[in-house]
């Protein structure tokens, strides 16, 4: 984790005081929440494939340029195996909809709004995200 802590300090200017592992979702990457005394949490990612990491970082930059709501990659290690990205919190969409699923699909108005916003964003990601995308 030293490489993530060094990357954090170089990027933020602050010492990392906590580096806590967080669960990954079906990925071979390892994820960590890094914070300093002032807060400033970032997610540190350690991958095993430079190509996969490069693709993720490229897509993040492309989607941000396209004004799409995706995590920003802040820093990438020299070897391309580690990077820092925005910390979007602990709650996934799947988690946020759990109560509605448990109630047999009877979602609250808040849960329905989350679903509506998510579904509405998908075509935008496909259309705007596909413009000028290097598919090679």
Regions found by a protein language model. Give the residues of each.
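ATP-binding glycine-rich phosphate-binding loop
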Residues: 14-35
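A short linear-motif detector with a strong N-terminal bias
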Residues: 10-13, 22-24, 62-64, 104
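Juxta-kinase regulatory segment immediately upstream of eukaryotic protein kinase catalytic domains
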Residues: 1-20
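Short linear sequence motifs
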Residues: 1, 24-25, 49, 56
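ATP-binding pocket architecture of kinase catalytic cores
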Residues: 32-136
